[in-house]
Regions:
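Extended active-site neighborhood of metal-dependent phosphoesterases/phosphodiesterases
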Residues: 1-59, 78-93, 101-144
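Short, compositionally biased P/S/T/A/G/V-rich stretches that sit at domain boundaries
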Residues: 139-171, 175
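Aromatic sugar-binding surface patches on proteins
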Residues: 203-214
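Blade/loop signatures of beta-propeller domains
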Residues: 252-282
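Extracytoplasmic beta-rich repeat domains
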Residues: 266, 285-300, 308-317, 330-344, ...
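Short loop/turn segments that connect beta-strands within beta-propeller blades
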Residues: 323-326, 363-367, 406-410, 449-453, ...
Length: 627
């Protein structure tokens, strides 16, 4: 709309105000769908005059539709009215939107802060959230993302079901949009009588509270009850209750093959595992102390490896290795910013790329940094793609910042020149048959020669420009979902072999799983979908609960969302959902045969090895189930 209409409804498009000792400046975007009633000269003259009238040294925070610069110096320029260096006026932060992403970084002495939509999923599948900034008298601030639509949500993730006796892990996810949690207390009862009363849990993240429940041998075989009370800063209370039974025998994870990439391998083909005995028992859970987003857990030589996000730039971004036997943290390696998508292992090195475009190579045994690179990606949007590794090479980045490196040395082998970066893209690179398949959100799906980096093909029709999901490679074919269709492509050429339109939105980060009879994938609003692999007709749908946090672009309530990729063991497929539950589903009829609720959304895919199933939640908890 025109600025005249905007101003007639909302008031001026550029203005300033003081709050405390800080001067806040609201500036307009330079243009839009219609020519605005102001010019860059008008705004620059006004801005110069405005800042000339504040006390020297006053902290300044500027709001605008978009980021002014990728550089460390913030210079507001005009056509004929000169320019003004905002760094000379004690600029503390530049707060912007436009990209529909959650991304915070430091540019020199200035923080740039972007927040996605508070009522719907972001363009890059960012969480629905609003940002609270706590600013002190010096203009220094802390940031806090608050996730919308949650009203005193509480769930006991552990203990639940059948547990091994001894000291039990207590994990509670609790969240409310309007108020942080002040404290969480638990009471354990046997036959209605307290065994332990009003014990305090420790806060691990904005979602999760954790502790331990010591139980003597006399409670073995008895059904016990855990009651939890959470008190919020605004005085509200939430309560939950869980029944569980202690047994003397411990469930011991016995790992087999490594799970080194998304869906187990670089082709993301999710090979079938041996059946898991149901019901699965929680062998252990541990919280890493930071939120876990789309970085699906890996299993490598007895270790579980995950990586965290740092949406508020408080130093929370790390890669972690946990002992697969008991969940203890073996090492953590700090990174500069959020790691938002798939990590991978090759040559006993784990690779991760952060939102600022840094690629990290970390020794899986020691957690020591082997090497790192600044990828030549654009300053915006944030790098949230998943990487892939295989046969001694790691592939990372996106657009003309997509590169191949020797895994052990970091030597660059090639850099993509054939296609450019898109919007924030949640798909993970797929590797196989000397082909690297990548995507750029709102642009296309691309095939590059894995040895040379040469662009071989691009496809964008019929919704393939929406690049949320990653393709699975089976033989000479690619299987993927996009927008409102399921596709089979010829991998070598990108030729569409099959396109099946679907009556629902599948713009999710879910790689299709091929079983012996089904093709199974997540959806934005209908839960898990299975097509008959011969006829491609819908075989079943398995509904799940409403997403605790919305992530699919422009999705709102109600949305039974699955942003993850399913895996299979025997006749059961396992999948994690945005409703905070991991499900075991009979692949023949779509019926739920096992589930475990955590109370925090699950954006990372399940990992399988031997008798163990590993999954993580957004609250920072990692869970290992086995039987």
């Amino acid at each position: 709309c025109s600025s005249d209409l905007f101003e007639s409804i909302y008031g001026p498009v550029y203005y300033s105000f003081d709050a405390g000792n800080v001067h806040y400046v609201v500036t307009p975007m330079p243009g839009g769908d219609h020519a605005p009633g102001y010019t860059s000269d008008d705004v620059c003259r006004w801005l110069k005059n405005d800042l000339a009238h504040i006390r020297p040294g006053t902290p300044v925070v500027v709001f605008n539709h978009d980021l002014l610069t990728y550089e460390d110096t913030f210079i507001f320029k005009s056509k004929n009215a000169g320019s003004i260096n905002l760094n000379e006026y004690n600029l503390k932060a530049w707060v912007y939107g436009h990209w529909h992403i959650n991304y915070m970084k430091k540019q020199g002495d200035v923080y740039s802060v972007c927040t996605s939509s508070l009522d719907k999923g972001g363009i890059d599948h960012s969480t629905t959230a609003f940002r609270v900034m706590h600013v002190d008298s010096k203009g220094d601030f802390t940031s806090e993302l608050r996730y919308t639509y949650l009203d005193k949500n509480i769930c006991i993730a552990s203990p639940a079901g059948v547990m091994a006796s001894g000291v039990l892990p207590v994990a509670v996810n609790v969240y409310s949009s309007v108020s942080p949690v002040r404290e969480v207390l638990y009471t354990c009862l046997a036959d209605g009588k307290p065994v332990l009363k009003n014990k305090r849990l420790l806060q691990s993240t904005d979602w999760s509270w954790n502790g331990e429940l010591p139980l003597s041998h006399k409670y073995v075989g008895k059904e016990l009850t855990l009651r939890v009370t959470a008190r919020f800063n605004n005085g509200e209370i939430a309560e939950a209750e869980s029944n569980f039974i202690c047994r003397t025998e411990k469930t011991v994870p016995l790992f087999s093959a490594d799970w080194d990439n998304l869906s187990g391998n670089a082709k993301h083909s999710a090979p079938v595992s041996a059946p898991l005995n149901l019901p699965l028992q929680l062998a252990w859970t541990n919280n890493v102390g930071a939120n876990l987003y789309m970085t699906s857990p890996l299993i490598h030589k007895g270790k579980v490896i995950v990586a965290s996000v740092d949406e508020d730039l408080k130093g929370a971004g790390h890669v972690y290795a946990l002992n697969g036997k008991d969940g203890t943290i073996l090492w953590s390696c700090p990174v500069r910013n959020s790691i938002k998508n798939s990590i991978a292992v090759d040559s006993d090195i784990v690779f991760a790329q952060d939102a600022q475009g840094f690629l990290y190579a970390i020794d899986t045994e020691t957690g020591k940094l082997c090497w790192e690179k600044q990828l030549p990606v654009n300053g915006l949007p944030a790098l949230i793609d998943g990487l892939v590794a295989g046969e001694g090479v790691v592939y990372a980045g996106t657009g003309k910042g997509l590169c191949a490196f020797e895994a052990r040395t970091g030597k660059q082998l090639w850099k993509n020149e054939g296609w450019g970066q898109g919007e924030g893209t949640t798909s993970t690179l797929t590797l196989g048959n000397n082909l690297l398949v990548a995507g750029a959100q709102w642009n296309a799906l691309y095939g590059n020669d894995a040895k040379t980096g040469e662009k071989l093909w691009a496809v964008s029709d019929n919704g393939l420009r929406n690049r949320g999901a990653s393709p699975a490679m089976h033989g000479a074919l690619l299987y993927l979902i996009s927008d409102k269709s399921f596709f089979i492509l010829e991998a070598a050429t990108g030729k569409v072999i099959v396109r099946k339109p679907l009556p629902y939105n599948v713009d999710v980060t879910s790689t299709p799983l091929l079983t012996d009879k089904e093709i199974i994938f997540g959806s934005a609003q209908k839960g898990l979908i299975a097509l008959d692999s011969e006829t491609l007709e819908e075989k079943w749908t398995c509904p799940v609960g409403d997403a605790l946090v919305y992530t699919c672009p422009y999705s709102r309530q109600p949305s039974a969302t699955i942003e993850t990729s399913a895996v299979w063991a025997g006749d059961i497929v396992y999948v994690a959902a945005s409703d905070g539950t991991v499900y075991g589903i009979n692949k023949e009829d779509g019926k739920v045969v096992w589930k475990h609720a955590t109370g925090a959304p699950m954006f990372g895919s399940v990992a399988l090895s031997g008798n163990a199933l590993v999954v993580s939640d957004f609250g920072g908890n990692v869970y290992l189930f086995c039987k």
